[in-house]
Amino acid sequence: ASCRTPKDCADPCRKETGCPYGKCMNRKCKCNRC
């Protein structure tokens, strides 16, 4: 998922890992694991 802020990653990361947290690196979400 593309992003500008870590908040942009909440929904895509929740879908991907079940965890609504991630970093935004090079405009791409890098999702954390819970």
UniProtKB/Swiss-Prot annotation:
Keywords: Amidation, Calcium-activated potassium channel impairing toxin, Disulfide bond, Ion channel impairing toxin, Neurotoxin, Pharmaceutical, Potassium channel impairing toxin, Secreted, Toxin, Voltage-gated potassium channel impairing toxin
Matches recorded under Gene3D superfamilies: Knottin, scorpion toxin-like (3.30.30.10)
Post-translational changes noted in the entry: Amidated. The amidated toxin shows 5-fold more affinity for Kv1.3/KCNA3 than the synthetic carboxylated form.
Alphabetical list of InterPro entries matching this protein: Scorpion_toxin-like_sf, Scorpion_toxinS_K_inh
UniProt-annotated site: Important for activity, residues: 21, 25-26, 33
Entry GO MF terms: ion channel inhibitor activity; potassium channel regulator activity; toxin activity
Tissue specificity of this protein: Expressed by the venom gland.
Residues bearing the modification Cysteine amide: 34
Major place of residence: secreted
Residues the UniProt record annotates as site (Critical for activity (is inserted in the pore, pointing downward)): 23
Similarity comment: Belongs to the short scorpion toxin superfamily. Potassium channel inhibitor family. Alpha-KTx 06 subfamily.
Miscellaneous field: Negative results: does not block Kv1.2/KCNA2 potassium channels. Does not induce hemolysis.
Protein name: Potassium channel toxin alpha-KTx 6.3
Organism, scientific name: Heterometrus spinifer
